């Protein structure tokens, strides 16, 4: 896999709650280049399940409207890595989180790791935080991502409403 597992343990209960997609990065521009791009998804909430899986509530544009989806990330032996089934992506890796302010994750296709890689920076509030953005940028340096999108708080609030 392309994405290194840098987190030792992940406390799922602590990542629960509302989040905002403040920045995205991808290995290929077509994954993010338009509102309707396949992996341009806006995370709303993370919900741990009783079996230590993670339910991800997200929104994306489809047929000119914003739709809400639920994606189940199933736990693996490694705390920060989950198996998912979303489009061609089959792994979700949590790169880093401090639980209170930010969480970085990547989605990848383990069978073609260099082709489809998308990472996101989630924040708890809509406040732009340069320190977190720099940290996200550093976390991406070892990854084959060539496209980055940073949203300002106003854009985030408007990005996909239901």
UniProtKB/Swiss-Prot annotation:
Quaternary context: Monomer.
A single GO cellular-component term on record: extracellular region
Stated family: Belongs to the calycin superfamily. Lipocalin family.
Main location: secreted
InterPro entries for this protein: Blactoglobulin (IPR002447), Calycin (IPR012674), Lipocalin (IPR002345), Lipocalin_CS (IPR022272), Lipocln_cytosolic_FA-bd_dom (IPR000566)
GO molecular function: retinol binding
Function: Lactoglobulin is the primary component of whey, it binds retinol and is probably involved in the transport of that molecule.
Pfam families the record matches: Lipocalin
Gene3D superfamilies attached to this UniProt entry: 2.40.128.20
CDD domains noted in UniProt: lipocalin_beta-LG-like
Domain of life according to the entry: Eukaryota
Keyword entries, A-Z: Disulfide bond, Milk protein, Retinol-binding, Secreted, Transport
Protein name: Beta-lactoglobulin-1
Subcellular location: Secreted
Disulfide linkage: 66-160, 106-119
């Amino acid at each position: 896999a392309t994405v290194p597992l840098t987190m030792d343990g992940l406390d799922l209960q602590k990542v629960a709650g509302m989040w905002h997609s403040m920045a995205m990065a991808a290995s290929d521009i077509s994954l993010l280049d338009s509102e309707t791009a396949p992996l341009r998804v806006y995370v709303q909430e993370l919900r741990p399940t009783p079996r230590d899986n993670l339910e991800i509530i997200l929104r994306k544009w489809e047929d000119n409207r914003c739709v809400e989806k639920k994606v189940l990330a199933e736990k693996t032996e490694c705390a920060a890595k989950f198996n998912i089934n979303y489009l061609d992506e089959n792994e979700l890796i949590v790169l880093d989180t401090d639980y209170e302010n930010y969480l970085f994750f990547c989605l990848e296709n383990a069978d073609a790791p260099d082709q489809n890689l998308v990472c996101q920076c989630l924040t708890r509030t809509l406040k732009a935080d340069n320190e977190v953005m720099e940290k996200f940028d550093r976390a991406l340096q070892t990854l084959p991502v060539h496209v980055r999108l940073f949203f300002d708080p106003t854009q985030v609030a408007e990005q996909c409403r239901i």
